[in-house]
Amino acid sequence: MKVVAFERQEQGTGASRRLRNAGKTTGIVYGGEAAPQKIELDHNALWHALKKEAFHSSILDLEVAGQSQQVLLRDVQYHPFKQLVLHVDFQRVDAKKKLHTKVPLHFLNAEVSPAVKLSSAVVSHVATEIEIECLPSALPEFLEVDLSKIEAGQSLHAKDIALPKGVALVAHIDAENPVVASATIPAGAVSDAAGEGETPAA
């Protein structure tokens, strides 16, 4: 995805306010061997781009003053109650160095799982994203979590996710192996099932 930005000359709270009034959002690009670079972006274009999942988890081509560089979106600051982006941070990407970043999880096939079809269980998505490490060229936009075999009372963990070639869980996630999805039978369904099994009193 391509992002167009402009070099920002003015600094300070007053300058940021003037830029916002002009429909601009402030930002910064950092990382790599180059010095941090202050930028400004068109607010409306940025606002719509931020609605796309891929904008948060893909390598972006950021063009500033005619020069293109590969970056990752690292932070977004929103106004507390207005539909307003106050500031964005981008980190430069080195094609030869592994990066650590979070990618979204897409859950598939819960409706055909034994948990749902046989036990009327509810499958809960405990995590919506997970932190991985890989070279920029191997970065996936998202990871798929196949729920087709989950049974009632079972959980799927981080290590159960099929990872593409060149992608690994970061060390602490690999060690902790957290739950990403679980299948539970609602309390009401358990009570109903127990009631159906009771023998009526004589």
UniProtKB/Swiss-Prot annotation:
Keywords: Ribonucleoprotein, Ribosomal protein, RNA-binding, rRNA-binding. Pfam families: Ribosomal_L25p (PF01386), Ribosomal_TL5_C (PF14693). Gene3D superfamilies: Ribosomal protein L25, beta domain (2.170.120.20), Ribosomal Protein L25, Chain P (2.40.240.10). GO terms for cellular component: cytosolic large ribosomal subunit. One of its GO terms (biological process) is translation. One of its GO terms (molecular function) is 5S rRNA binding. Belongs to the bacterial ribosomal protein bL25 family. CTC subfamily. Part of the 50S ribosomal subunit; part of the 5S rRNA/L5/L18/L25 subcomplex. Contacts the 5S rRNA. Binds to the 5S rRNA independently of L5 and L18. This is one of the proteins that binds to the 5S RNA in the ribosome where it forms part of the central protuberance. This is Large ribosomal subunit protein bL25. It comes from Burkholderia ambifaria (strain MC40-6).
